[in-house]
């Protein structure tokens, strides 16, 4: 029943005369009350709970989740299309399983529908019944036949099937291989007999987010489903993960082993070690009567190592702080003097050389047989030889990986890290990339952070490098300032020996923030890419500079 005009007129006047209200929704006209989903709130008309206004101003129902194969007719209420059922119309109805059966002979359920087929010797009629047909009996179809204008022929129950060459057997159509399947970019196609479906890529899972289903990344690290070693850190990536060994461990991340640490003090105090043999050799000096030519070289036992606990490089923190060379060298000399005093006891050795038979206490003659028994190795470090050649140069930065005042940093955005390796003479370390690190074309970067350089017109960068092994990879050097400029590259080293590279850096180098050593893995399985002592010299590179090989 319509309200009296006396009541309706005051409600209409503001809208007609251009008042604040501009829509009949704000004044509860009775005509709106007959629309579905419209409710009266006091003197106003608005969409009921569970309904919302569309762009045409009509209230429409809301369903969450949406009706997949149907329409929303009320709040969270779906009306399914024929062939589908369920709360959100996602379940297929098996028409072949209901009673009465829709087909006389064979019934094949399809997605959202069904198809009828007749036994051999029968023909399918429009009303889904079958009639005898001698022609169909001769065809001997796999799934049945149908009557066409050209005559009876075999049919397949799905659009994902096709008739074989004999015209009787149905073969599967691989929609994934034929590009007929349409899957989102983050899903992959899986073929089935007569159809296909879309599945999330490996490392992703299907979730309902933002009113739709989507494939999201699986965080294997958070779910603890990764195979990383207990001594490795798990780093989640899109669709996968990475394993990196923790500080103090080495390996591929799946298997990590402790980096061995050998103490110099333990070696010297072990029973029957080289300490006793040195005393024996010193006692033998009085028996020598032949004049010998002395070589002023300090021997080191091959088994003695610099303790790795003092290695200034930290793979966990990514940054290496250089140590004070003078302070540590002073401590080593004091420790050496204390050990010599313990060995001498109350005896004192004359620190002078007698031409006929007396040797200094800290020098050994190569003609003494006991020297071979001691298995002594005379240390000739290539780094020292290299620096002797540059002793007259103005060195601005002098860096190595065991001594020196400089900062080294691993790149956290690359594919693998550089690792410290023992030098051949067991004294100190250099940085290397083994051939088994990473995969082909993977990149590992090592940065040398430069301090505030004194402005100069030119600089020369000197460094020792080695590419050992067949097809081990490439070594590049970048100079980082406003942009990363490739300054040097080496792809192979035929003999695999240590060499020294030099790069002339011209005016403007004082604005450089770092020098980057980049290793790119090849397909070789043996060898390594290595870098050692780095020098930054003020001025031009010397013309008489010779590469140091070792």
UniProtKB/Swiss-Prot annotation:
Q: Which cysteines are joined by disulfide bonds?
A: 59-72, 63-78, 80-89, 96-107, 103-116, 118-130, 176-189, 183-198, 221-234, 228-243, 245-256
The record's tissue-specificity note reads: Expressed at basement membrane of pelage follicles (at protein level).
Name the coiled-coil region(s): 327-357
What residue range is the signal peptide? 1-18
Q: Specify the glycosylation sites in chain numbering.
A: 394
Looking at the UniProt record for this protein, which Gene Ontology cellular component terms does it annotate, in alphabetical order?
basement membrane; extracellular matrix; extracellular region; membrane
Q: Does the keyword Kinase apply?
A: no
Keywords, sorted A to Z: Basement membrane, Calcium, Cell adhesion, Coiled coil, Developmental protein, Differentiation, Disulfide bond, EGF-like domain, Extracellular matrix, Glycoprotein, Repeat, Secreted, Signal
| InterPro entries associated with the record | ConA-like_dom_sf, EGF-like_Ca-bd_dom, EGF-like_dom, EGF-type_Asp/Asn_hydroxyl_site, EGF_Ca-bd_CS, EGF_dom, Growth_fac_rcpt_cys_sf, MAM_dom
Location in the cell: Secreted, Extracellular space, Extracellular matrix, Basement membrane
Q: Does the keyword Transmembrane apply?
A: no
Biased-composition ranges for Basic and acidic residues? 318-354
Q: Cite the MAM domain residue spans from the record.
A: 397-543
Function text: May bind integrin alpha-8/beta-1 and play a role in hair follicle morphogenesis. Promotes matrix assembly.
Which protein family is it in? Belongs to the nephronectin family.
What is the protein named?
Answer: Epidermal growth factor-like protein 6
Q: What organism does the record attribute this protein to?
A: Mus musculus
């Amino acid at each position: 029943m319509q309200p009296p005009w006396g009541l309706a007129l005051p409600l209409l006047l503001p809208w007609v005369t251009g008042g604040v209200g501009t829509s009949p929704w704000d004044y509860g006209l009775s005509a709106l009350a007959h629309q579905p989903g419209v409710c009266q709130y006091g003197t106003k008309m608005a969409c009921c709970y569970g309904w919302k206004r569309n762009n045409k101003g009509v209230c429409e129902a809301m369903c969450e989740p949406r009706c997949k194969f149907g329409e929303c007719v009320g709040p969270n209420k779906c009306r399914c299309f024929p062939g589908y059922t369920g709360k959100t119309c996602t379940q297929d109805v098996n028409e072949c399983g209901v009673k009465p059966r829709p087909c006389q002979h064979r019934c094949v359920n399809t997605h959202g529908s069904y198809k009828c087929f007749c036994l051999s010797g029968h023909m399918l009629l429009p009303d889904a019944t079958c009639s005898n047909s001698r022609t169909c009996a001769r065809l001997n179809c796999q799934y049945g036949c149908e009557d066409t204008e050209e005559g009876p022929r075999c049919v397949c129950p799905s659009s994902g099937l096709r008739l074989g060459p004999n015209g009787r057997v149905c073969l599967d159509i691989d929609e994934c291989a034929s590009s007929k399947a349409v899957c989102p970019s983050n899903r992959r196609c899986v073929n089935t007999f007569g159809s296909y479906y879309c599945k999330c890529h490996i490392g992703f899972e299907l979730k309902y987010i933002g009113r739709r289903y989507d494939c999201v990344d699986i965080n294997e690290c958070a779910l603890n489903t990764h195979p990383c070693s207990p001594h490795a850190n798990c780093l989640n990536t899109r669709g996968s993960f990475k394993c990196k060994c923790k500080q103090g461990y080495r390996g591929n991340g799946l298997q990590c082993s402790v980096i061995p640490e050998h103490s110099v003090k333990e070696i010297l105090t072990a029973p029957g070690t080289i300490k006793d043999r040195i005393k024996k050799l010193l006692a033998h000096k009085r028996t020598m009567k032949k004049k010998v030519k002395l070589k002023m070289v300090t021997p080191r036992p091959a088994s003695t190592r610099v303790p790795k606990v003092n290695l200034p490089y930290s793979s966990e923190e990514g940054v290496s702080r250089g140590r004070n060379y003078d302070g540590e060298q002073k401590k080593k000399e004091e420790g050496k003097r204390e050990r010599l005093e313990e060995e001498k006891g109350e005896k004192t050795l004359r620190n002078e050389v007698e031409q006929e038979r007396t040797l200094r206490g800290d020098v050994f003659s190569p003609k003494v047989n006991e020297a071979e028994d001691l298995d002594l190795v005379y240390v000739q470090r290539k780094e020292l030889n290299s620096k002797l050649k540059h002793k007259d140069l103005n060195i601005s930065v002098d860096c190595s990986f065991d001594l020196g005042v400089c900062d080294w940093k691993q790149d956290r955005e690359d594919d693998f890290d550089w690792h410290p390796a023992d030098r051949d003479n067991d004294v100190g370390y250099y940085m290397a990339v083994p051939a088994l690190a990473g995969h082909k074309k993977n990149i590992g970067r090592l940065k040398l952070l430069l301090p505030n350089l004194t402005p100069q017109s030119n600089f020369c960068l000197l460094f020792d490098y080695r590419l050992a092994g067949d097809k081990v990879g490439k070594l590049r050097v970048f100079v980082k300032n406003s942009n990363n400029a490739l300054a040097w590259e080496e792809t192979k080293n035929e003999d695999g020996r240590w060499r020294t590279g030099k790069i002339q850096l011209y005016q403007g180098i004082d604005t450089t923030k770092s020098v980057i050593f980049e290793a790119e893995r090849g397909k070789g399985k043996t060898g390594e890419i290595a870098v050692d002592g780095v020098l930054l010299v003020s001025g031009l590179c010397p013309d008489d500079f010779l590469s140091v090989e070792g």
